């Protein structure tokens, strides 16, 4: 097993300070990141750079490595790197040598376990109309690159084309496996989670799987009954207003709410009685005739009663 020249890998000198090495690491990590670089050996180079940074960014491990590198050409050191028959050592032999020179801490540091990458969570805005059918969406997000200390060194822009299934609800989470940050030492990538946010609609309010819409009607439409055109998510329908309807009354339109795999909600039309503008003399006379005809009607009769 070859003792790697971590300084050469990073393109720095052994005398360079941590700030210089950190700058080199950021530049190389961006250059060779598998999601950005088009070079065939990008993944291998990226891991090599990460390995070098993991050692050189730690003061104690860097000192141990420098000592090992300094004695790499010593006869005693060279003899330890070969068997008596001249054959190269294996990984187990290297671990024994590594441990004998720097102690158990170095061996434990060398044998770092595979670590799963971090998950990423982003919010995706979806219009109500888009929930009716499956649709494709291009999303962009930043992929964090972590250093050996678990701190974010940089963020690399990434773009994906994804499918948003029909019937998604507000707050629903969609998992895209392996689209999070890369794992370390052969560990699996993290996942990308899309958190659905249903954008506010100018007409409809969401109540579970149902929708509510406020329908303005005139006093005479409420009193006499009428048929009015009401929009739904798919098309407009003709809604029947029963005679004697009241303000705030809810009229149910079955099957015109949100659609999911389990159920289809309903649409509720909430009536809002809208008065005409200030009446002229003739209109005021008609309102007075109505008031005289309904003089026994007391709208506040049960006001305040349970």
Swiss-Prot record:
Its main location: cytoplasm. GO terms for biological process: chaperone cofactor-dependent protein refolding; protein refolding. Keywords: Chaperone, Cytoplasm, DNA-binding. Residues 5-69 form the J domain. It is found in: Cytoplasm, Nucleoid. Gene3D superfamilies: DnaJ domain, Single helix bin, Urease metallochaperone UreE, N-terminal domain. The keyword DNA-binding applies. NCBIfam families: PRK10266.1 (NF007618). PANTHER family: DNAJ HOMOLOG 1, MITOCHONDRIAL-RELATED (PTHR43096:SF52). This is Curved DNA-binding protein. It comes from Escherichia coli (strain SMS-3-5 / SECEC). The gene is cbpA.
């Amino acid at each position: 097993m070859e003792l790697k020249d971590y300084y050469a890998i990073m393109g720095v000198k052994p005398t360079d300070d941590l700030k210089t090495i950190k700058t080199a690491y950021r530049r190389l990590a961006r250059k060779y990141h598998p999601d950005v670089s088009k070079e065939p050996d990008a993944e291998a180079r990226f891991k090599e750079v990460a390995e070098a940074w993991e050692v050189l960014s730690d003061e104690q491990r860097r000192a141990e490595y420098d000592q090992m590198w300094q004695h790499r050409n010593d006869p005693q050191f060279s003899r330890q790197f070969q068997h008596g028959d001249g054959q190269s050592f294996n990984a187990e032999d290297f671990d024994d040598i590594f441990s004998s020179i720097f102690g158990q801490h170095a061996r434990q540091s060398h044998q770092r376990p595979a670590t799963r990458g971090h998950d990423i969570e982003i919010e995706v805005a979806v219009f109500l109309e888009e929930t009716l059918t499956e649709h494709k969406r291009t999303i962009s997000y930043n992929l964090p690159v972590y250093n050996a200390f678990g701190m974010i060194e940089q963020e690399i822009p990434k773009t994906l084309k994804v499918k948003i299934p029909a019937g998604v609800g507000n707050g629903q989470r969609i998992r895209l496996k392996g689209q999070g940050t890369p794992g370390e030492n052969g560990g699996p990538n993290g996942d990308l989670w899309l958190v659905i946010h249903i954008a506010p609609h100018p007409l409809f309010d969401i109540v579970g799987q149902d929708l509510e819409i406020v329908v303005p009607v005139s006093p005479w439409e409420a009193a006499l009954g009428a048929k009015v055109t009401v929009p739904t998510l798919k098309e407009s329908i003709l809604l029947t207003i029963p005679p004697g309807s009241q303000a705030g009354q809810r009229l149910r339109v079955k099957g015109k709410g949100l659609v999911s795999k389990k159920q289809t909600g309903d649409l509720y039309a909430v009536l809002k009685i809208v008065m005409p503008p200030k009446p002229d003399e003739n209109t005021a006379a008609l309102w007075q005739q109505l008031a005289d005809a309904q003089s026994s009607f007391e709208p506040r009769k049960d006001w305040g009663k349970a």
